[in-house]
């Protein structure tokens, strides 16, 4: 099954290309989850978090997890991606999600260089801003160049990292930390 097998692509090349395509697919899924209202209702659980730390990387609605798995499975099957490439991709994706959601500061000169290739915590923190223009930016998890390529990159938050508001303006307060409240969020109006 899959394009790599149909065209007899060497396993190493297939693995590298699969990794890059899967990363683009996850970036695209993230963009679409912000742009399509039904998917945003589900994804906003992730953005309702008023903090920005490792737990934010794990804060996804079960419906979003299922949809993401189906999307990635479709890509994997269509490509005929090598199993080892998929395993490596998932390990890197989860590790990078924890890294770029970490409430950590990398020295600015180092961050400037790193973010040309990978998503850094400061780069992704902009995406969790309560400012809509900033929320709709910096969608990447692994590679940062997708945002530059498709003009969704924002360098710094308008208010600066120390003064920016994290989360969504419509969902502030202690309720956002309640598991049952967040699980019901896709079914709430607005």
Model-derived features: where do they sit?
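Membrane-embedded catalytic scaffold of the fatty acid hydroxylase/desaturase
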Residues: 3-162
